[in-house]
């Protein structure tokens, strides 16, 4: 009820009278902390990063199997890397390498505000807008969902107005807090908004794409299923069911 809402979220907009409380709901700073931690962990295990490189094409044997990738380095040099297996995790751009994959971009705009420390202790999900608090008082505000924008870059007045309206509705006091950043990105979406996992249309190619808004949430199980496939580990019944449910060609009649 309203009393409970005010206890959990002081300053909540007056139009809200009921809500659902998820005690175990949380958040992580994926842009700054999570990705840096993952990079350090990968480097410690011997993973080599080629920053700024672009994969131009997948190399195939005469029988159609994957045999390598053709890429361009950050310095503009083209080269081939030989491999028998590869994982496609190119997000919204996955279809550029494998045209038959049903992955398309959904643009999202976001912004952040600097509020007082601990001004908001709960993540708030409203219709079309959410507020995510960080430890230092930073509030991340998201996000638009623009299915017709394609890969159009940049912020838009309509998108920013939507976010500002959401702030005013959910936490009116935050509307006066100074903005810190504004940015946009492209979610990798599929027709049913579920990911594409498991073997791809090219023998030797494994898929880990199309996660839409749930990339971080599904990262662990995606990694487990993908690593198992690459290592030729036989899936158990539960894993086999997941791989079947999220196969890339499930939309075909």
Predicted features along the sequence, with ranges:
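Conserved beta-strand-loop-beta-strand element in the redox core of flavoprotein oxidoreductases
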Residues: 56-81, 86
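Flavin (primarily FAD) cofactor-binding/catalytic cores of flavoenzymes
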Residues: 25, 32-44, 52-55, 69-75, ...
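C-terminal catalytic lobe of FAD-dependent flavoproteins
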Residues: 31, 173-253
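Active-site lid/adjacent beta-loop-alpha segment flanking the redox-cofactor pocket in flavoenzymes
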Residues: 117-204
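A short alpha-helix-loop-beta-strand transition element characteristic
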Residues: 1-6, 103, 123, 233-241
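Flavin (FAD/FMN) cofactor-binding and adjacent substrate-gating region
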Residues: 1-45, 50-51, 57-65, 189
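Central helical "cap/lid" subdomain
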Residues: 76-125, 153-157, 173, 237
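Short glycine-/acidic-enriched loop or helix-start segments at secondary-structure transitions
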Residues: 60, 97-99, 150-152, 217-218
């Amino acid at each position: 009820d309203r009393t409970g809402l005010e206890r959990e979220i002081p300053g909540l907009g007056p139009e809200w009278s009921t809500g659902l409380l998820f005690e175990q709901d949380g958040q992580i700073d994926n842009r700054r902390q999570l990705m840096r931690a993952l990079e350090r962990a990968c480097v410690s295990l011997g993973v080599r990063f080629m920053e700024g490189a672009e994969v131009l094409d997948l190399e195939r044997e005469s029988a159609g199997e994957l045999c390598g990738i053709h890429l361009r380095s950050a310095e503009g040099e083209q080269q081939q890397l030989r491999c028998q297996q590869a994982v496609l995790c190119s997000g919204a751009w996955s279809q550029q390498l494998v045209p038959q994959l049903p992955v398309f971009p959904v643009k999202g705009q976001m912004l952040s505000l600097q509020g007082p420390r601990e001004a908001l202790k709960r993540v708030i999900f409203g219709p079309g807008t959410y507020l995510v608090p960080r430890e230092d008082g930073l509030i991340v505000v998201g996000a638009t969902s623009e299915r017709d924008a394609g890969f159009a870059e940049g912020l838009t007045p309509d998108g920013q107005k939507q976010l500002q309206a959401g702030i005013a509705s959910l936490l009116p006091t935050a509307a006066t807090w100074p903005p810190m950043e504004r940015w946009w990105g492209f979610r990798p979406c599929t027709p049913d908004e579920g990911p594409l996992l498991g073997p791809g249309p090219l023998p030797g190619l494994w898929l880990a794409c199309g996660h839409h808004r749930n990339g971080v949430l599904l990262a662990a199980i995606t990694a487990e299923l993908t690593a198992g496939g690459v290592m030729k580990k036989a899936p158990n019944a539960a894993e086999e069911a997941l791989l079947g449910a999220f196969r890339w060609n499930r939309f075909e009649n």
